[in-house]
Curated annotation (Swiss-Prot):
Keywords tagged on the record: ATP-binding, Biotin biosynthesis, Cytoplasm, Ligase, Magnesium, Metal-binding, Nucleotide-binding
Keyword Transmembrane helix in annotation: no
Known EC number: 6.3.3.3
Keyword Metal-binding annotated: yes
CDD domains in UniProt: DTBS
Protein's name according to its UniProt entry: ATP-dependent dethiobiotin synthetase BioD
GO CC annotations, alphabetized: cytosol
Active site, UniProt feature: K37
Binding site for ATP: E12, V13, G14, K15, T16, V17, D51, E112, G113, A114, G115
Oligomeric form and interacting partners: Homodimer.
GO terms for biological process, alphabetical: biotin biosynthetic process
EC main group: ligase
Amino acid sequence: MSGFFITATDTEVGKTVVAGALAGVFRELGYNIGVYKALQSGHVASNPEGDAARLKVLSGVPTKEDEICPYSIEEPLAPRLAMKRAGRAVTLKDIIHHYNERLKEFNSLFVEGAGGLAVPYTEDALVIDFAKELQLPLIVVARPTLGTVNHTVLTIAYAKAHGLTVAGVILSGCKECEMERVQENKVMIEELSGVPVLGLLPFFEGEFTKEEVLESAKEYIMISKLEEFIRNESTVAHTSSN
């Protein structure tokens, strides 16, 4: 298996934009990559404002929205609570099954979590339990502003304590007028966590196009560093199968 698990320090930080943009860029580079978000609350999968629809558009995958996200609910709550209130029972086994179904279509998947790693996810697991099952390297998406050093370092420490590999951090929503502080936060995160900040993705104001997002990802994210992970994972997987 190869790909990335995209998590964040909080909700509404930019995971979907990052996950979709990275998948879109890698697909342009010729990689057979899909996207997967097991559970979504706040919108049903078919809603164009929801994460599943945005992942589909940004990545350019042919997968249907309800296959990208097999479990979705309208109420904007933590997934476990939203599903419980809707009378739906979703287990870790269920979402792993759908993950494996997507792997029949793609060589690699970029998997988006929900909120942060400690979010109650299925009825029997947190987001981090799902990440541990997949054993994909993490990309941590974080805010660029005040408070992000603490949130990001804690997220990385939590991931490492559970045996997960953190490929890097992407600060999302960076504004030109704040770049001096953003750069200071970048340096501090790297010093305190030992994990590289691989990108400073700009703030997208108002409506934006797929092309604008992908071009920004190419310009502001170290795609080559992430490509090394994909290649190394593919090599390990190939060696293990022989």
